[in-house]
């Protein structure tokens, strides 16, 4: 799921993804937006 969080690296996406989807969430940075 793409969430409305800007990013330059996947590390920036982990905290918001974990917050929404729980601690087992994975995260990627695609086109400047986080994808969980």
From Swiss-Prot:
Q: Provide the disulphide bond pattern.
A: 7-29, 13-34, 17-36
Which PROSITE patterns does the annotation name?
Answer: SCORP_SHORT_TOXIN
Q: Which UniProt keywords apply?
A: Calcium-activated potassium channel impairing toxin, Disulfide bond, Ion channel impairing toxin, Neurotoxin, Potassium channel impairing toxin, Secreted, Toxin
Chief subcellular location equals secreted
Asked if the keyword DNA repair belongs to this entry, the reply reads no
Give the UniProt subcellular location, in the record's own words: Secreted
Site annotation Basic residue of the functional dyad: residues: 28
Report the family membership. Answer: Belongs to the short scorpion toxin superfamily. Potassium channel inhibitor family. Alpha-KTx 02 subfamily.
Name-wise, this protein is: Potassium channel toxin alpha-KTx 2.7
